[in-house]
Amino acid sequence: IAPAGEMAATAAETIIGSVAHALQSEADDERPIISGELPIGGHRFEGLLPPVVASPTFTIRRRASRLLPLDDYIADKVMTEAQATVIRSAIANRLNIVIAGGTGSGKTTLANAVIAEIIASAPDDRMVILEDTAEIRCAAENAVCLHTSDTIDMARLLKSTMRLRPDRIIVGEVRDGAALTLLKAWNTGHPGGVTTV
């Protein structure tokens, strides 16, 4: 990551407060963490205020500008043809796919490529997509997107998903206790899903 420059703490706090307001939330000592999607561009925002940090800080993570299909991964030598074949076979056999990696490693970009392959091979499947921040790109005609909020967590969305008759459950990023709920959903008649960890 290249240095982005310097900013006065008061300016950073003002930006975090403005983003919180745009997200219909508050940023203060009692609610010092703001996470969400910027209203313009849909980029991810994470802002932190004291007391969880010494000085106000925030990060903006840009969305990928375009969808990278699996064939581009092969052409760019990011993955081999054999690896792409394994992914395509997993999709065809309705196996669940878990994509793991560090922050900024391209998990969501790869998940979007996998989802595009699912749509190409099973265009009639009903996709239910759950996310904290809208990052999944899904061109399926029969897709329902659910988002967490301050009062609705991922585990609650997963429970609701079971009543939406999904063919495939896709979770943008699963963590904590929601992972067990997702595994139970996948193992009770909803195979062929995708998630990142």
Language model features by range: what are they?
Residues 2-93:
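P-loop NTP-binding catalytic core
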Residues 84, 94-100, 109, 113-197:
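Switch/coupling sub-region of P-loop NTPases
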Residues 90, 102-103:
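P-loop (Walker A) phosphate-binding loop of NTP-binding proteins
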Residues 106:
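Conserved glycine(s) of the Walker
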